[in-house]
């Protein structure tokens, strides 16, 4: 997962609070215990400050996880950390919803608030 893949562009409306929601319904990674693929939906919601996340670079960033052995919780926190590092949003929430494995689903949500 190469953070340097991520790109941003200038926010044309930095004086206005507005929410951007990005959904990736086809996210994949690998279970570090079993080596089997994990499938999930990643939702990123954020209020930008000076920059916005460029979507093509985000797509390629997400593809970096495809062969990575990483737990759900770590995926979610890593994505938040990397996106906050490159875009410095006013606030951001990353929610990952994972398909059933053994009849159990999991959802992980993590947030960042710049004013906190």
Curated annotation (Swiss-Prot):
It is found in: Cytoplasm. SUPFAM superfamilies: Tetrahydrobiopterin biosynthesis enzymes-like (SSF55620). It comes from the Bacteria. Gene3D superfamilies: 3.30.1130.10. One of its GO terms (cellular component) is cytoplasm. InterPro entries: GTP-CH-I_C/QueF, NADPH_dep_7-cyano-7-deazaG_red, QueF, QueF_type1. Signal peptide: none annotated. Pathway: tRNA modification; tRNA-queuosine biosynthesis. The active site is at 31 (thioimide intermediate), 38 (proton donor). Its main location: cytoplasm. HAMAP family: QueF_type1. PANTHER family: NADPH-DEPENDENT 7-CYANO-7-DEAZAGUANINE REDUCTASE (PTHR34354:SF1). Belongs to the GTP cyclohydrolase I family. QueF type 1 subfamily. This is NADPH-dependent 7-cyano-7-deazaguanine reductase. It comes from Chlorobium luteolum (strain DSM 273 / BCRC 81028 / 2530) (Pelodictyon luteolum).
